[in-house]
Amino acid sequence: MKTALVTGAAGFIGSHVVRELLSEGVHVRCLVRPGERTDNLDGLVVEIREGDVRDPAAVGRAVKGVDTVFHLAAVYAIWMPDWSKIYEVNVQGSRNVLWACLRGGVGRVVFTSSIAAIGIAPGRGVSSEKTPFNQYTLGSHYVLTKYLSQQEALGFAANGLDVVVVNPCFPFGPMDIAPTPTGQIIVDILRGVSRFSFPGGINVVDVRDVARGHICAARRGKTGELYVLGNRNIAMDDFVRLVCRVAGIDGRIVFKVPVPLMKIGTAALSWLSDHVTRRPPLSTPVEIAYASQYLYFDNTKAVTELGMSFRDVEASIAESVAWFRSRGYA
């Protein structure tokens, strides 16, 4: 791997993938949207190309001359005034990238999907790459578009394009400028505005391990295969307490909110967003329905086939807390 294109390069995971590639001496071309915030790329010796994955011509120019493409560009949203954009970017945009890679003779594509595109085991069961997708009726446009785009990638893999798929879990770590949903949980705890929890669990993973997983997938992944990039399965209660302990603050959970009550409250917020504010609500009933499941995943395949190892979660949380505090988030 000598030259690589990274779509979504200015994003949380994407910028860490860029850094991993640079550390290995790879020439990196970054595709960023016109006017997009690029703080995470400041100071890096990279080639910047402006373009939108919805524009086939721009994508075709971007892939020209690279041997590897890392496709991370995607829209993540719990609410939008017009949901068409999430399909245009996540599904059609992915199709544009895959077609450009096939036509341009790109040697390998690492396609960033999500655990959202994998099925959820019942109860507190642990899912793997083989768990059939079972979230069709959830009603989440994000979840559905991630699954549909993953199917596009697998279809191209079956028709001659060397594509390997990675499925990150819930990443956290430094440079989470947005912040991401996992990072926002940490920020809210540090600010003292979140001392409640709800049923469910997640798989947390250091974003730098996720980035490393992309490189390992490019080098060792099998065409047409999925690889879960996750580390530790943890109940939401325990995650809140762990962040509090690492941060040195009171870890008592004041209130555990029943899921039905959360759905009622978020339904009201969603109605206000739809009809009054036209701004994203704090949460939605669909997001609660998804997040209140136990989103537990097995990383065995990434460990055995990609050679992955993972950082200590507590040490990673400590670094994340320090980063947020040093930049005034809390």
Q: Regions from the language model: what does each represent?
A:
Residues 92-142:
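Conserved Rossmann-fold NAD(P)-dependent oxidoreductase catalytic core, especially the SDR/UDP-sugar
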Residues 139-141, 169-178, 195-208:
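Glycine-rich "substrate-gating" loop/helix at the edge of Rossmann-like oxidoreductase active sites
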Residues 213-281, 315-330:
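Mid/C-terminal beta-alpha module of Rossmann-like enzyme folds, strongest
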Residues 194-199, 204-209, 259-305, 310:
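A hydrophobic C-terminal alpha-helical subdomain
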Residues 35-42, 46-92, 100:
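NAD(P)H-binding glycine-rich loop region in Rossmannoid oxidoreductase-like domains
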Residues 4-24:
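N-terminal Rossmann NAD(P)H-binding glycine-rich loop of SDR-like oxidoreductase domains
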Residues 96, 148, 181, 198-218, ...:
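Substrate-positioning beta->alpha
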Residues 113, 151-174:
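Conserved beta-loop-beta element that borders a ligand/cofactor-binding pocket
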